[in-house]
Amino acid sequence: MSNELTDRKFWANYWESKTDLAFQVPATYTFNQLFKKLLAHKPIKTAIELGGFPGYYAIFLKKYFGLHTTLFDFYVHQPVLKDVLAANQLTQQDVKVIEGDLFKYQPQEQYDLVLSCGLIEHFQDTKDIIDRHLQFLNPGGTLFITLPNFTGVNGWVQRTYDMDNYNKHNISSMNPTLLAQYCQQLGLKDVEAYYYGYYSIWLENMKQQSAATKGFLKLLWAAGKVFTKVVPVESKALSPYIVVRAVK
């Protein structure tokens, strides 16, 4: 059985269906506080974003922290990438790009920081895909992984309104305890795995939903935001993300 839950055609269709991809990545981009904390305490100069097309985090780390960044993906739409870089006052010389298969590619160099944001949940064998990250990582380097949490309210939204997208995700991977165990089994140190963010919901196909559905989801989003202002707790039920961090 193939390890991948998606293929090249899926991602080609996915990115070609998107509009407004070329925006200026803000200093407040998702996970910015975590990156600030990490970079304040570690001498990180190089980073590679795996499965990250169109490279928003590689751009973020280059633009705001001056890191030497690389984007690795098995599908890179060059016109989109060029537009995204230009929107951030960068050129194709500023972010190195490697188009390749993570299961076949032999890294030519290693990096101080290896990150992926929304990659590992698209594979059946979670431990194996985490292990694939490590070949890119310098000894003493930091592994930083994020993935969506579809085991709570946001998962219900996905199952109810976009089952096709839900099925492209390995829901069993969305378990911080299990993710920490995998990292420890792979020999990583200082392992942290936890739910992140108080609350959010989204749909990839929101534009295709009815007005009634859009209205309901807007109310559900607002209700969750109000609740988590009163009870600001990160949890399986409400947090939109899971974060994993470890040292090689």
Q: Predicted regions span which residues?
A:
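Conserved N-terminal segment of class I S-adenosyl-L-methionine
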Residues: M1-E109, L113, C117, I130, ...
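S-adenosyl-L-methionine-dependent methyltransferase catalytic module, highlighting the catalytic core
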Residues: N3-R8, N13-Y29, N88, L102-F103, ...
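A short His-aromatic
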Residues: G118-H122
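Generic detector of intrinsically disordered, low-complexity, polar/charged segments
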Residues: I48-G52, V97, L115, N138, ...
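Short conserved AdoMet
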Residues: K62, G66, Q124, N138
